[in-house]
Amino acid sequence: MKTKEAVELLAALAQETRLSIFRALVQAGPEGLAAGRIAEAVATPASTLSFHLKELSSAGLVRSRQDGRFIYYSADYAAMNELVTFLGEKCCVGASGAAGCAPKAQLNKQRSGA
């Protein structure tokens, strides 16, 4: 991932309602949620929700699919994982005692000897 792409993804998430929507979709899993369920989950009117879903979709963080009368939205896990990897890929490369900034799961593995 290039820095410009990361900035676009982070900009899309840098708004409270959009971040709440994205987190709800991440929690829902790959099947996603219908727009009405998202609106309920984040207590947002349909017109406002539509705007935010469009922003998240344009950034590449959310996918949509039609199923009958309903549109289901889901998080794009590949994009999310790519962003997380980008953010942490050079974590502490220049620091001594790098274990202090390693992700928690990695620290737990190191402590258990796995």
Residue ranges and their predicted role:
Residues 45-46, 52:
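Short coil turns linking two alpha-helices in DNA-binding domains
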